[in-house]
Amino acid sequence: PLARTNAFGLVLYPGTSTPGSVSFGAWAAKGNNLTILDYAEARAANESGRLSGEELLEVERNVMPGSGTCGAMFTANTMSTIAESIGMMLPRGASHPADYEASSPMHADVRSQAKASVDALYRLIAAGIRPLDIMTERAFENAITTVYAMGGSTNMYLHLLAIAREAQVPIGIERI
């Protein structure tokens, strides 16, 4: 809605979930590095009879033990990277964890980003700088380059084109 309404605002990302762990099979060797990608592998192993239903449930329960988005470069992490590279999120806002191994409700980096974002928003309001002043054609080109460099989700085509249209920035599929 920021591109559509041009209302003062910034994006704040909650962070990425801490990886989990389980104590059986090939996943035990990963230690505390179980991610959403491992769930897909576990699901296939279950469907082929190599993993029991109970083990699949254990992987499912532990793949994202805390808050935040999945720990892979899928849509949420790609779009947070776009928000940062387009200028609508503070630097380093797309790259912090959401929590500490699910033992804390919020990672200190998230709290710090929230406070810094509010402070920055007040400065933007005082200066009269709105989202469409930030979301320029050059900012979109920066976002496209960043996503390609990081190997982001192909969903970015849909989302970036929609945001560009709302921001009235002439970026079409041929430029992405």
Residue ranges and their predicted role:
Residues 176:
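Hard-cation-handling environments
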Residues 158-169:
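Alpha-helical support elements that line or immediately flank enzyme active sites
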Residues 172:
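Short, well-structured active-site flanking segments
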